[in-house]
């Protein structure tokens, strides 16, 4: 089982890396790195080891920010100095905003929508992959923080006009008074689909509750991959030490429990 974090930070300062982590039966964490060359290495494509076929799903990792970013260590509270030194994170922790594009069963599915900043790379990268905004069939929302939905609306209009927008009902109910969420829901109108955990979703995508970072934070499984939103903000720290929370986690106790549950699930598989 492979896990993809939409706050795609890494354990090394490299330009536009893609990291997935596996956990083997002995609790040993290994990092697998894929770096694509071409078009500024902004897009990563992950497929099975046997080589892609015309019908084989493809998962593209798109880095929304055009340059590497670093989060200050202070966002994670009091981290012991010896741990900081051993992890070499005294100068901050690498971070990025990422969007996943899944090509499966003849459909194009996005997971979250990036931050929508002027320098966003989402639309240019989709264009390079051969897709216009109108080609996106569905968008699955992990949670409704601005850096995950900001790229879905522009000038009060949907950026992806043909897409169904799948939002976990627990998450949407928690943010009904937020102006940016109201704008999002109004823009997509009848294309907004509220769903509960356990509901059937397109292309066999499975939603799983991972509450804590936000009230209804949701992760998604597609085949042997997990797309886990903001379950972790700092892989370098939180993979081995999941009790550390970023300031962004709204309910620290639940966020820790969700992190540990995901890590345990991957370890079992």
For the regions a language model picked out, list residue spans one by one.
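Short, Lys/Arg-enriched N-terminal segments with co-localized hydrophobic residues
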Residues: 8-30
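Sec-dependent signal peptide recognition
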Residues: 32-38
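Bacterial N-terminal signal peptides
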Residues: 38-45
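Zn-dependent metallo-beta-lactamase
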Residues: 49-105
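Active-site neighborhood of phospho(di)ester-bond hydrolases with catalytic His/Asp-centered motifs
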Residues: 111-113, 137-147, 166-168, 209-212, ...
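Active-site HxH/HxHxD metal-binding segment of metal-dependent hydrolases
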Residues: 114-190
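Metallo-beta-lactamase
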Residues: 161-209, 214-269
